[in-house]
Amino acid sequence: MEDAHHHHWTMVERRGTQLWASGRPFIIHGFNTYWLMSFAADQATRLRVTAAIAEAGLNVCCTWAFSDGGYRALQTAPFHYDEDVFRALDFVVSEARRHNMRLILSLCNNWEDYGGKAQYVRWGKEAGLDLTSEDDFFSDPTIKSYYKAFVEAVVTRINTVTNETYKDDPTILAWELINEPRCPSDPSGDTLQAWMEEMASYVKSIDPVHLLEIGIEGFYGPSIPELLPVNPDEYSGHAGIDFIRNHQAPGIDLASIHVYSDIWLPQSIKENHLQFVDKWMQQHIDDAANLLGMPIVVGEFGVSVKDGKFGNEFREDFMKTIYRIFLSSWKEGVIGGGCLLWQLFPEGAEHMDDGYAVIFAKSPSTLSLLANHLRCLEC
């Protein structure tokens, strides 16, 4: 682990398929806690933000730097931002730095949680645009201008706590264009590809230094048909996503995938899930290393224990499988990057649990697993 107090806190950079910082390899051993900004916006819950960061014992957190419309929105309307909520994001970034933790900041959502592309399309309709689908988010010029303005506002933000511009702050490991984008209205992938290329270029024009990832789940698309059987189902190949083609967009630095076999696979035979995870991970690692030449970031992975179909024992077997495959490839020098669990919570945030949350105080065996993976990375 880096220590910002004893080492110069430098940007994480990409060297081929590896990540480096402060003159040595950097491996992501991280987690997701998406609600940090919204909790920081309320004095009653702000301490849980510090707890989430300080108690994790990991080195990277992925969190949402967006909240579009609705309660305590950061973006209240196109080109209009709530300064109090922006200051909450400032607090999150400053707390991460204080605890030697890097951040991956996501800039939008494919889903309706915290607004997302649906909210952008609603704003467009309110402005008189002739929009027929949420997928118009990816193609309408006016909607794209809304997104670009928001991205610029975040990336060029001067942190009121540290007085450092976000685009100059090494606490931020990477920007994420959008969480889990899909565009099923154009299964060819052309619409989403054009959007990714345009937005990657735009982000890099403002901030050429920070790393950039897309945020896709990693489904294979029509550009390489022989890889379609790796997908969990036939629908995945028609979602407008194309793992190889998407990551060939200029400006993208990290190959991002998610792993949710409990959602993607209909059956509950545990061994089938672990076999799928093994194949899914291995194929993407091979492709990231050999076809794309970039690190892989398993940006989200987890198992819900909410409905009783799977328990904590299986969740831990699932996690061990993810970590084992990544660790093996990294030790062999094949790939760098890392993995971020969905999700890790301090006490007092249980009401935000979607079934996937690992609560610090209630999950000693899972925390032991996380600590063991850290030891393996450091040995």
Curated annotation (Swiss-Prot):
Record-linked Gene3D superfamilies: Glycosidases
Catalyses which reaction(s): Random hydrolysis of (1->4)-beta-D-mannosidic linkages in mannans, galactomannans and glucomannans
InterPro entries the record matches: Glyco_hydro_5, Glyco_hydro_5_CS, Glycoside_hydrolase_SF, MAN-like
Membrane-spanning ranges: none
UniProt EC number: 3.2.1.78
Annotated tissue distribution: Expression not detected.
Record: active site: 180 (proton donor), 300 (nucleophile)
SS bond list: none
Broadest EC class assigned to this enzyme: hydrolase
Molecular function terms from GO: mannan endo-1,4-beta-mannosidase activity
Binding site for substrate: 64, 179, 260, 342
The entry's keywords: Glycosidase, Hydrolase
Taxonomic superkingdom: Eukaryota
UniProt record, GO biological process: polysaccharide catabolic process
Family as reported in the entry's similarity comment: Belongs to the glycosyl hydrolase 5 (cellulase A) family.
Protein's name in the database: Mannan endo-1,4-beta-mannosidase 7
